[in-house]
């Protein structure tokens, strides 16, 4: 967690840089995060009693449900995973079991902490890597192995002394060469020289066939056990000094990091700061109470998710993980089902409910221009690489937003994702011709938008297939 936790207002302000509108959802998530910090300041007895208030987000696709959770995780540096409820099956059926979401969370936590530890030891690792590169550039003489014959040992005393003296001189000469080479390396004069580096051979896992069968965890555990018994194969690869430095720095960093400590920290961070985003939760709700063989395991999946959400212990290869204080954010469009179609026990585990509103024309205008790295900025940057400066008039931006809104209303509402389709269609010809034309500046006007999109947008049948 951050040393200086953000206040709820600061969190909302940060989210506003990337996501337009949806203030209720932003506030709910901001308060949930701040409560984690407040809880950490309490004494241990009371701290154990306070559990996070899980959030259920309801709203059509493409309005920012997933993005809010993803941005929150980046802001806090918390382990975050997004999973889809439809991927899981009830115990007894072929497929992933719900406990795998906790194992995935711990793996994410391990990766985060490993990256932090690597950044801490990066200087030392680079220094060690440079020393190895110098030894590769100026290899030492291989010592003669083998037993001398007895007569040589008895009568060749002077020869042995001479050999030792020659070895010392050679060693001194070698050290001098390596010092010169290290100096050249520090100046960056040897970056394109080639060296032969011994690296671990990446072999396909024999347990890949278990993926998606619900037995992948067993496969991973067996693979770990076997990797400790069987030494890893190594092969020599020829690469530039620049590439070798990256490979060897990673190797050296791995030697400096205590993976047992990383595992312990990862479990603790996953328990205290983990966020699990369960998408498409409406798809496992029973629709209208009618049951069929096709959705026989929907309620079973809900019942399997229930103990994870309310707090249980899951065994992972890094240790046991308690889910009591993991924050769960569930989301769904709920256009075919209602939150009340979920089993009552699961409904009770998501006390905070937030409805995200549909996007208006004004929202589409803001999405196009306001966020950091907004869509229009992305397209402008892409075409700038071809030497074309792309400019959108305010009226053209408004027109694009109106087209996106009306197509959403007339066909399926896919929210802000509709803008990707609209802009690709609008700029298709320009993107295709860009490398071959000599235009420096292109202005996108309402007339241009109407010319490219008007016919398709106004024809409901066409827009269903093209936009």
Swiss-Prot record:
Annotated GO biological process: protein unfolding; proteolysis involved in protein catabolic process
Subcellular location: Cytoplasm
UniProt xrefs under Pfam families: AAA, AAA_2, ClpB_D2-small
Coiled-coil residue spans: none
Function text: ATPase subunit of a proteasome-like degradation complex; this subunit has chaperone activity.
Quaternary organization: A double ring-shaped homohexamer of ClpQ is capped on each side by a ring-shaped ClpY homohexamer. The assembly of the ClpQ/ClpY complex is dependent on binding of ATP.
Protein name stated in the entry: ATP-dependent protease ATPase subunit ClpY
Organism of provenance: Bacillus velezensis (strain DSM 23117 / BGSC 10A6 / LMG 26770 / FZB42) (Bacillus amyloliquefaciens subsp. plantarum)
This protein's encoding gene: clpY
């Amino acid at each position: 967690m951050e040393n200086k936790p953000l206040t709820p207002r600061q969190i909302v302000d940060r989210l506003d840089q990337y996501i337009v509108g949806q203030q209720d959802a932003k506030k709910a998530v901001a308060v949930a995060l701040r409560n984690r910090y407040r809880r950490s300041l309490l004494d241990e007895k009371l701290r154990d009693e306070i559990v996070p208030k899980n959030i259920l987000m309801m709203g059509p696709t493409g309005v920012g449900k997933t993005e809010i959770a993803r941005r929150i995780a980046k802001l806090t540096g918390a382990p975050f995973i997004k999973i889809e409820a439809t991927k899981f099956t009830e115990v007894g059926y072929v497929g992933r079991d719900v406990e795998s979401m906790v194992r995935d969370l711990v793996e994410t936590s391990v990766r985060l902490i490993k990256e932090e530890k690597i950044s801490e030891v990066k200087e030392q690792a680079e220094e060690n890597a440079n020393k190895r590169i110098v030894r590769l550039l100026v290899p030492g003489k291989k010592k003669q192995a083998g037993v001398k014959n007895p007569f040589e040992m008895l009568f060749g005393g002077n020869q042995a002394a001479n050999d030792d003296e020659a070895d010392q001189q050679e060693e001194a000469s070698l050290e001098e060469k390596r010092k010169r080479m290290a100096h050249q390396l520090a100046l960056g004069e040897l970056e394109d020289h080639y060296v032969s580096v011994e690296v671990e051979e990446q072999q396909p896992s024999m347990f890949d066939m278990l993926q998606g069968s619900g037995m992948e965890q067993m496969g991973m555990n067996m693979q770990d056990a076997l990797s400790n018994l069987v030494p890893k194969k190594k092969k020599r690869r020829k690469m530039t000094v620049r590439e070798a430095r990256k490979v060897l720095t990673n190797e050296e960093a791995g030697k400096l990091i205590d993976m047992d400590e990383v595992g312990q920290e990862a479990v603790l961070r996953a328990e205290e700061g983990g966020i699990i985003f369960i998408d498409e939760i409406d798809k496992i709700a029973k629709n209208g109470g009618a049951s069929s063989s096709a959705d026989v395991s929907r309620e079973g999946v809900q019942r399997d998710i229930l103990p994870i959400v309310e707090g249980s212990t899951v065994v992972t290869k890094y240790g046991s993980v308690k889910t009591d204080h993991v924050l769960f954010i569930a989301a769904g469009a709920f256009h075919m089902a209602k939150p009340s179609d979920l089993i009552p026990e699961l409904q009770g585990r998501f006390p905070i409910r937030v409805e995200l509103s549909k996007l208006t024309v004004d929202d589409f205008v803001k999405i196009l221009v306001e966020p950091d790295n907004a869509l229009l900025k992305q397209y402008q940057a892409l075409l700038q690489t071809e030497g074309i400066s792309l400019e959108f008039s305010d009226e053209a931006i408004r027109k694009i937003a109106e087209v996106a809104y009306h197509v959403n209303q007339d066909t399926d509402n896919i929210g802000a994702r509709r803008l990707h389709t609209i802009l690709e269609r609008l700029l298709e010809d320009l993107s295709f011709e860009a490398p071959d034309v000599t235009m420096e500046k292109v202005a996108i006007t309402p007339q241009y938008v109407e010319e490219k999109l008007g016919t398709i947008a106004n024809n409901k049948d066409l827009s269903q297939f093209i936009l």
